[in-house]
UniProtKB/Swiss-Prot annotation:
Xref: Pfam families: HIG_1_N (PF04588)
Membrane topology label: Multi-pass membrane protein
Protein name as annotated: Respiratory supercomplex factor 1, mitochondrial
Compartment(s) of residence: Mitochondrion membrane
Coiled coil regions in record: 95-132
Biological process according to GO: mitochondrial respirasome assembly
Length: 187
């Protein structure tokens, strides 16, 4: 699946690049654990304290239950502090990496603008090509009306691109000429 290369900055912080493709939950967990290991450890400790308080409550030991509930609150607070500190250090680390590689917001915006303009030029060229081809194609069927020489009934024939191609190839088109209900006008 995704292969992440872990880089360590001079400050000692670990930088794990994020792939643009699909990242499964195991890869995401391992990446997040490597970025900030205190958060998952704190979550496990919080769950452990909550389970211990439930066990003590079932045993009828209310003082021990209160101890584990207070421990859960403290551990949860430490976990949240680790989460905030980790996100702040990651933000500072990413800023350092951007400065080191020279990729800043301005260069990102310029690159996106250039990519957009190149796609726009390609779309305009395709539009002009389609417009040039549209002038050379047949636009819809042409209708011919004529009077049948023997019966005098007026008939109509639609010439479509398929019918013209079939006529040129010497075949008969699968749809015959459709008669029109109007009688010939004399005059």
């Amino acid at each position: 699946m995704a292969s992440n290369t872990i880089a360590q900055s001079p400050s000692g912080a670990i930088h794990v690049p994020i792939d643009q493709g699909y990242e499964g939950w195991t890869e995401k967990f391992s990446r997040k654990f490597k970025e900030n290991p205190w958060v998952p450890i704190g979550c496990v400790a919080t769950c452990g304290a909550l389970i211990m308080s439930a066990v003590k409550m079932r045993a009828g030991k209310s003082t021990d239950m209160n101890y584990w509930l207070r421990a859960r609150v403290v551990i949860q607070g430490v976990t949240i502090a680790a989460l905030v500190a980790g996100s702040m250090s990651l933000q500072a680390q990413r800023k350092k990496v951007e400065e080191a590689t020279g990729v800043t917001e301005e260069t990102k915006k310029e690159r996106e603008k250039e990519e957009f303009e190149s796609r726009l030029r390609g779309a305009q060229a395709a539009y002009e090509e389609e417009a040039a081809l549209a002038g050379k194609t047949v636009k819809g069927p042409t209708v011919k009306r004529h009077v049948h020489p023997e019966t005098g009934a007026q008939e109509r024939e639609e010439e479509t691109v398929e019918r013209k191609a079939a006529t040129l190839a010497g075949r008969q088109h699968p749809h015959p000429v459709a008669p029109v209900d109007k009688k010939p006008q004399e005059g």
